């Protein structure tokens, strides 16, 4: 996954930056918009995967402890209720995307949400803590 999909996003970022620079030099506005869109897509894929890699463990995982466990209990009622809500977010994605557990720094609480495709437009003030890749290749 790392050497294929994530590497393709990094290459896509580099290619889009080069093509964007060329399009700007030529005042080719159609190409500018296309390459800005491509840059956003590939940069989103890179960012999402970079967060996801940090969520993985060779030994699997278990229920969190400490402050995170307390925050999950406060926000969702229990770890099992969080798992049910997070699973619903993941399984409810239409098409490709990501399920996310994030810390809302403005509201001082945890929440779950979905990112579609490779969007990296996480809501303002949200810090992603856990992301699950729900693309068909995952």
Curated annotation (Swiss-Prot):
It catalyses: 2 superoxide + 2 H(+) = H2O2 + O2. The keyword Oxidoreductase applies. InterPro entries: Fe/Mn_Superoxide_Dismutase, Mn/Fe_SOD, Mn/Fe_SOD_C, Mn/Fe_SOD_N, Mn/Fe_SOD_N_sf, SOD_C_sf. GO terms for molecular function: metal ion binding; superoxide dismutase activity. Binds 1 Mn(2+) ion per subunit. Its cofactor is Mn(2+). The keyword Manganese applies. Mn(2+) binds at residues 1, 49, 133, 137. Its EC number is 1.15.1.1. This is Superoxide dismutase [Mn].
């Amino acid at each position: 996954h790392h050497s294929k999909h994530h590497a393709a996003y990094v290459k896509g970022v580099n290619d889009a930056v080069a093509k964007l620079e060329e399009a700007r030099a030529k005042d080719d506005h159609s190409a500018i918009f296309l390459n800005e869109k491509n840059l956003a897509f590939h940069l989103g894929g890179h960012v999402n995967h970079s967060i996801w890699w940090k969520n993985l463990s060779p030994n699997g995982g278990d229920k969190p402890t400490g402050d995170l466990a307390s925050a999950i209990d406060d926000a969702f009622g229990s770890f099992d209720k969080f798992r049910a809500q997070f699973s619903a977010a993941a399984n409810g994605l239409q098409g490709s995307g990501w399920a996310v557990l994030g810390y809302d720094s403005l509201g001082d609480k945890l929440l779950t949400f979905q990112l579609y495709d490779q969007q990296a437009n996480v809501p303002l003030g949200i810090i992603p803590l856990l992301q699950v890749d729900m693309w068909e290749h995952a």
